[in-house]
Design a protein with these regions (language model features):
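Electropositive phosphate-/nucleotide-binding environments in soluble metabolic enzymes
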Residues: 10, 14, 30, 34, ...
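Alpha-helix C-terminal capping/helix-to-coil transition sites in glycosyltransferase folds
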Residues: 71-72, 191, 243
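Internal alpha-helical scaffold of NAD(P)-dependent oxidoreductase catalytic cores
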Residues: 84, 95, 120, 124-131, ...
């Protein structure tokens, strides 16, 4: 049996822990909240973050002790909120076994540095690229927790190590594919959240299919241009991690980014939408980072820029869309 540790027991971390357990691994969840640790360890239930799953697999346990969590780990999965990753992972730097692979479920761009999560993880843990993997795809945590059929992509510069991580999370209902395009996977996972915010806002404001389709396709063009400028393979953006994740995130009330945007479209302020949000909408802190990244790479980011105005200036959905359209005729 492979020993797998999941750092972070939120909804997605716990749902993915269940996938790993269903795949036959020994799974240890690490959390800082004592009530979550006790719930998973003693009752096989995460009533705080994933109450819909009444009984988690018996080969899942939990601890709040960092050293205990990673001591015997073959694979370590990072499922921490993106903006807190650097601080949280610093506590594990001297504890992680030298042979362990580290895989990230995180989707976001670090606001303070503009760096992708692969860069943050490898810098913080002093980890070589061939021991890091990113996992991303159309993976809404509630559906994965309910064991609905789904697929994802595992990226690592070392394809053998990508395969090891993929094998550890392969079940009858969860199918991972592998690639070496870490940059592409990271860019897809991060940038689609900004598009989901915009689509959700348009839906919340009462706009229909044409508007949503326009935002999604322009969002895809924007994130593809950014990704390619950063060194990604353009094909990645038209697969599961790109178009696939965009479809899932922009079309479901299960998506926290879509729901956050919908609440903005209904007239809630950013502060009000944050209060009623169930979990972290990573697109909110990522938006400004995407605009800054576009400036750095000399790539226009009109959608991210308009959503930045929404979040920072409080402009309305109609104003956001008017700004997105502009007045000049351009090529698609």
């Amino acid at each position: 049996m492979t020993n797998v540790t999941v750092l972070g027991a939120g909804a997605w971390g716990t749902a993915f822990g269940q996938v790993l357990a269903d795949a036959g691994n020994n799974v240890t969840m690490w959390a800082i909240e004592p009530e979550i640790v006790e719930g998973i360890r003693d009752h096989h239930h995460n009533g705080v973050r994933l109450p819909s799953v009444k009984v988690l697999p018996s080969n899942m346990t939990a601890t709040g002790d960092r050293a205990e969590a990673v001591a015997n780990a073959d694979i370590i999965i990072v499922a921490i909120a993106a903006q807190f990753a650097r601080v949280a992972l610093a506590e594990f730097k001297e504890l992680i076994p030298e042979t362990a692979l580290v895989a990230s479920l995180m989707k976001g761009i670090e606001r303070t540095t503009g760096k992708r999560m692969d860069e943050v993880v490898m810098e913080t843990l002093d980890l070589p690229a061939d021991r890091f993997a990113a996992i991303s795809g159309p993976n809404l945590s509630k559906e994965i927790a309910d064991r609905h059929p789904a697929a994802t992509v595992v990226a690592c510069t070392n394809l053998d190590n990508a395969t090891k991580v993929a094998e550890a999370c392969t079940t009858s209902y969860f199918k991972p594919f592998v690639t070496t395009d870490v940059i592409g996977l990271e860019m897809c996972g991060s940038l689609k959240n900004v598009t989901a915010l915009a689509v959700g806002m348009a839906r919340g404001a009462g706009y229909g299919e044409n508007t949503a389709a326009m935002i999604e396709t322009r969002g895809l063009a924007e994130l593809t241009a950014l990704g390619v400028a950063a060194g990604a393979d353009p094909k990645t953006f038209f697969g599961l991690a790109g178009v696939g994740d965009l479809i899932a995130t922009c079309g479901s009330s299960l998506s926290r980014n879509y729901t956050f945007g919908a609440n903005l479209g209904k007239g809630l302020t950013v502060e009000e939408a944050t209060k009623v949000s169930n979990g972290v909408a990573e697109g909110v802190p990522t938006t400004d980072a995407v605009v800054a990244l576009g400036d750095q790479l000399d790539v226009p980011t009109p959608l991210a820029y308009q959503m930045s105005r929404v979040l920072n200036e409080g402009i309305s959905c109609s104003e956001m869309l008017a700004g997105l359209f502009g007045h000049e005729v351009t090529g698609e």
